[in-house]
Amino acid sequence: MAQKRSHNHKDHTAKAIKRRKFNAATAKSSDDAAHDIVSVDQLDWKTVTLPDRLDDAEGFYGLEEIEGVDILRPSGGGEIKFKASKSKIKGILKNSTDKSGQPAEDWEEWSGFGDDSEDGDGTTLEAEKKAENHGKVNDRRTKTNNSNKEKESNKLPKDRGPRIKTDNGIKTGVSFAALQDEVEEDVDVSAWDSLDLSAELQTSLGRLKFSSPTPIQSACIPAVLQGHDVIGKASTGSGKTLAFGIPIVEYFLGKYRGGRAPTASEERESTKEPMALILSPTRELAHQLNKHLTDLVNHAPNTQVRIATVTGGLSIYKQQRLLADADIIIATPGRLWEVVGSMTGFLSKLKKIRFLVIDEADRLLSEGHFKEVEEILNAIDKVEITEEAYGERSEREPEPEPDEEKKAEPRQTLVFSATFHKGLQQKLSGKIRYRNDDLLDKKESMEYLLRKLNFREERPKFIDVNPISQMAQNLKEGLVQCAPMDKDLLLYTLLLYHPKHRTLVFTNSISAVRRLTQLLQNLNLPTFALHSSMAQKARLRSVERFSSLSSDPSSILVATDVAARGLDIKGIDLIVHYHIPRTADTYVHRSGRTARASASGKSILICAPEETTGVARLVAKIHSNKKDSSATESKMEKKVPLQSVDLDRRIIDRLRPRVTLAKKITESILAKEKLSSEDDWLRSAAEDLGVDYDSDEFAEQQSKGKGKGRGRGGGRQAREQKAASLSKAELAGLKAQLRELVSKKVNVGISEKYLTAGRVDVDALLRGEGNDAFLGHVEKLSF
């Protein structure tokens, strides 16, 4: 029997401990070899730049930072060390750069002469081998490219025929249509000669078909070019954008010697400071200003002006890149203030702008709105006094005033709007104190703006080209009175009365926009929505679809007052005020979306009985000066401010079934969407709380708590629940009935069997002329 071998556990334990110590020492040595340990003074610390909007840092100045190191804290205290890898240590040490700013050479320990011989020209054998291999690779690439070209040439069709040799200096394929366009674009711009504009701008104006300046342009452009601060007031659609856009571009052309764009060396030498800042109250107006100025610049030869638009709803990082080298900045106040706060050093550049333009100033400077405007104005007007300036002065010299220490930049302030008086911003509803004074008083408007803005001149030039009326001359204003529940019916009737007319419908709430858009779409009308709760891309998409030349000429845009200012869309013939505007200036800007320039347009108010007080105050504020004007304006006195629009009651009665069905369908769809969103919110809240949620049980308890529709909002909730209770089959039946009604023409008392017996023009029907919505003769609106 063999003897059993005994194991010594103590020896194995000792060997394992020794092995772990050896491995730890090896790892430590390898870690120390791969990293360098340095002290605090050896690192090249970088100064932390503080944000521009940080006024009071509470002592946190002179902060420095370093990246790419680890902190080593001694166990027994002592100096803190920093560890970094050898690949990164070269870039963070103080001596890693020489005096010239170039990286220092990598000094290595001398290890003697190598085995490789060196030629007389200092090229090693290893370098020669690398060059030889590189040449072989290039030869292979050349052969590959040649073979690919041969293959592509072989793939060409054989019946192409022999190639025609052409001169490299002559471009082929240019059609004569381009020459024809050049001839057609020639417009007589001799009317602009009195403004002394450059040849580049006159060429651009000719290509844009602007043959003569408008009154506001003729009055403002010379004053701005002379360096004056200007306050311009003109009716909507009078060309106020070019009144300040042309002088800004003219200044740019004069700065670069007649339109020459800055060279690359000039761009490197310059700090890329913006030249002009244009503030806009809405995103749509900002993008429209960008479009107009871009068209002006693109049609001017040899002119390269960089324009950046900063609005909400778009990428803030992209806007930061655009601001870095922008010449003209067009922005809404909120997003601009946000971007300025996230950038370093940009506020100091913004203080050096040459032009500050405030478009729609009455809205931007109104009390309680756009707080960021005041912050932006205070920031660019703030004067900083550096410590170096005080250090250079002797102690005997008195402290200088801020104006003496750093003189303000020669910035021009340009203010434009169609309404300036604060009385127009008072609410039309409710109890207000009515003052029977001149609502367009020049003195009050000047004092109001002088308190808000820091003009360079003591008294800026106030230019008012239409002191009597703020409305466009070719605008017709009408009024439709209706019952409280018939607004939808009269709106639909007005739209049918104006076929092939682009119509803009204004409401006072977002919920009304959503409901009317759904209602008109159910009535088979091309309708788009626009309100502030929409995403920015959706807003731009709605405006693009509504204003596109390829879209339906009967397109309808239902919008809140976000579209009331500055929106310049060609072809808008009708403005319908579904709700009476809250203020008189809003009515002016709403109606200004039509009858722009020399075109004509209509503006119609739909007035319910409870809105008559607001309409009376509106007429008193807007049209009061017409009665008090001089005898030379006798023609305007004969014109009734708001003409009554008489609609045919037969047509209204025949359209009522359509609108009733459309309202039922719309209310059902919106109620289902609302209940679904509320149910989703309650379900997610129940999951967060960890409780069970039953929608039917919750609805039953809620109805019991409300007391069967009693209390505030109880009746509305009961109607919504009833509308949402419609099944899919019932909803589909209502839609089928509505489609059948909409597919037919509205008969106004004509026999469909004997068309020739009445007043129907059969030839016009066959040609598609007249109003396709009606069957029979319909009188046009009298106003």
Curated annotation (Swiss-Prot):
One of its GO terms (cellular component) is nucleolus. Residues 105-121 have a biased composition (Acidic residues). It is found in: Nucleus, Nucleolus. GO terms for biological process: rRNA processing. A motif (Q motif) lies at residues 190-218. Keywords: ATP-binding, Helicase, Hydrolase, Nucleotide-binding, Nucleus, Ribosome biogenesis, RNA-binding, rRNA processing. PROSITE patterns: DEAD_ATP_HELICASE, HELICASE_ATP_BIND_1, HELICASE_CTER, Q_MOTIF. ATP binds at A234, S235, T236, G237, S238, G239, K240, T241. This is ATP-dependent RNA helicase MAK5. The lineage of its organism: Eukaryota, Fungi, Dikarya, Ascomycota, Pezizomycotina.
